[in-house]
Amino acid sequence: MATGRSFAEFVKNKCYNGLYRAAENYVDSDWRSLNLYTRHVHRIGEVELVDVNIQRVYVHDLPGMRVGFDVGLELEIEVKEGDYHYDESDTCFPWIRISCEGDLSCGLDDWEITSIAPYNQKNPPLNSLSDALVPYIPFDRLEDEAAAFLKEFYPEALKVTPYGQKPVSVEPDILVKRLGLQTMTRRVREDGSVYGQLYFVDTDAEMFDAKTGTVAKQHIPGRTIVVDPQTVLLRTIGCANNTIVHECVHWVKHRKVFELEKLYNENASCISCEVVGGAASAVAEQATEMMERQANQLAPRIQMPAVSYTHLTLP
């Protein structure tokens, strides 16, 4: 799966006409709120929107496949003289902020505007997702993110057990079922360089057939984590478990990245986990590094949450 598509570019192509109409209506009714500055016009009479330019797109996470996005729109406004003693005109370039929401699963066909206001460049909207829709997770929030993950999908793992009793283990098979996923064992590559792959949609994927020594297409249902058996044979069962939890993190945290990719490439199907810790595809480096780093950091914290294990190290 090629990741790293630009949500801002998609918004520019998808929403431009609607944003233009909204800006036009706003200028007609609320241009005074823009505090237009002009050196030539003594008293503003008529104003007319000439053009708009999308300068910023800030995106934040919403439940499900919905996203909120704030568009910083630069307006080109022609200002005409309102004092009949003069015949001057000028052009102003104020910004407005148009707040929107939409559902990625329908390609933002349902997108709607929730508010419009003058843009405050000193206090821009905050991004909770990157332009590729990868969530921003600061290092000091990793434990909190892992705890929130478990609270939703495996709350018993957060239980602090009495002294002398082992904490509740996160069983990958149970976690997979709770997420509505399934696992499948297949040789992904001959050299065993791919630990696992998460398939979001049904696809005919190329897998290595150990019996024939060739690569052949096999049908993989959507919502499936494929784990290479070499992960266990050449390493440990713990490595296989970590791979499954790693892919579960991708499912919960990075589905929006996949949905955005699908809007550009309808053949996209999976995210892969390589031995080297990256994604096995031609990808945008920054987005891929963010996703893999997050999955690598969160997977062990989900399997050994701080709240359940810290007391084991205390004297």
Model-flagged regions — what are they?
Residues 168-182:
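Zn2+-dependent metallopeptidase catalytic core
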Residues 189-243, 254-255:
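Active-site scaffold of zinc-dependent metalloenzymes
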Residues 1-143:
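N-terminal low-structure segments adjacent to metalloprotease catalytic domains
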Residues 138-162:
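A short, surface-exposed helix-loop junction/capping segment
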Residues 310-315:
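Conserved small/polar residues in nucleotide/adenosyl-binding loops
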Residues 254-286:
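Post-HEXXH active-site segment of zinc metalloproteases
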Residues 217-226, 266-276, 303-306:
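A short mid-domain helix/strand-loop element embedded in enzyme catalytic domains
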Residues 288-304:
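An active-site-proximal "capping" alpha-helix that borders the catalytic cofactor pocket
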